[in-house]
Amino acid sequence: MRTSVTPLGLAALILPLALLPAIARAQTATSTKDFAVIGTVPAMCAGGTLSGDGTFDLGVLTDTTTGLLRTDLAAPDKVLVGSFCSTRSTLNLAATPMTAQGFTATAPGGFSRTVNYTATASGWTTTAASFDTAASANTAATQIRGTAFTGDIVVGIGNFATGGGQALRLVADPNYRGLVTVTLSVAD
């Protein structure tokens, strides 16, 4: 059986197809919804990674001819690579004198068991932090940076002096020790 389509029937089929775009345009009302994307970044500081080892090795401290503290003592700087704070920060430097670890009694007359020095930490602020182990106050030991920052902190030691005076000799001891501490923290 064969079905034939009359011109009226064909128009009835085509007319709805022709109206589809008009119907779609009539339904263009939209609804928009916004979604907030949020997160947080805490205020934090990290001291970075130490390049090399964490020891300032000065070797023999005295001139073996005179027994007095060597005047040419030096040690390579240490670097804290990639230190950062995500906000305003404080760098605090502290140090302890080098003292004889085995000889703990009071040194006899003419001798000392202490070597003082100055520690510095530079690169974090325009003025390096410094700490003198012989000083009663170290106001330059704390430095404040007003902005977030990332960079290297270079730590060094120098200006060595015998505790009690340069005319004193150091008591024999295979282990003189001091400590330098760098603290990086979020500022109040």
Task: Put a short name on every predicted segment.
Residues 5, 84-90, 123, 131, ...:
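Compositionally biased regions
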Residues 111-140:
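Terminal beta-strand-rich extracellular "head" domains
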Residues 21-23:
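N-terminal signal peptide c-region/cleavage motif recognized by signal peptidases
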Residues 1-12:
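Bacterial N-terminal signal peptides that target proteins for export
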Residues 25-116, 141-188:
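N-terminal small/polar-rich segments of proteins
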Residues 11-19:
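Bacterial N-terminal signal peptides
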